[in-house]
């Protein structure tokens, strides 16, 4: 996306937009943000059961993508009823508000093994590694949602 913007190549930018919306990898927002909990303002990131370093890195990268697109007139912050905000609130609730009673949806991913095959890995609880680590990633989504959109982003 950034290369498409920098080089003024709309075809490259559009490829990134399409991948973000309907791609087949975890670069698609609805794969990176794995599950939206009904009746809450929370959505679980695909990395949540792995560890919090990867979870928060995902938040930072998604925020950058959303901001790049927003500056081009495409509002990914609002995509799927503010799905990214729900993921930020979920990650912040666990990492910064230190809530331990958050809902969790089991996630199974296909890990490559040393024999060239696939070994499924089941994540059935929130990953604790790196929990509470300070990362400079929440200012962007907080400002966008609370100051530009006037939405509640208290945990973010």
Where do the protein language model's features map onto the residues?
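CBM-like carbohydrate-recognition segments
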Residues: 76-156
């Amino acid at each position: 996306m950034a290369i498409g913007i920098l080089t003024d190549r709309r075809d490259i930018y559009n490829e990134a937009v399409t991948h973000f919306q309907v791609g087949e990898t975890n670069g698609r927002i609805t794969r990176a943000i794995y599950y939206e909990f009904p009746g809450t303002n929370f959505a679980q990131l695909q990395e949540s059961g792995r560890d919090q370093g990867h979870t928060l890195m995902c938040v930072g990268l998604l925020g950058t993508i959303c901001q790049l697109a927003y500056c081009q007139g495409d509002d990914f912050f609002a995509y799927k009823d503010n799905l990214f905000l729900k993921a930020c609130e979920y990650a912040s609730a666990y990492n910064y508000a230190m809530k331990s009673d958050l809902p969790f949806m089991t996630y199974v991913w296909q890990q490559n093994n040393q024999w060239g095959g696939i070994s499924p890995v089941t994540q059935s609880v929130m990953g604790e590694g790196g929990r509470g680590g300070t990362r400079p990633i929440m200012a962007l989504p907080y400002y966008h949602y609370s100051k530009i959109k006037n939405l509640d982003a208290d945990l973010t």
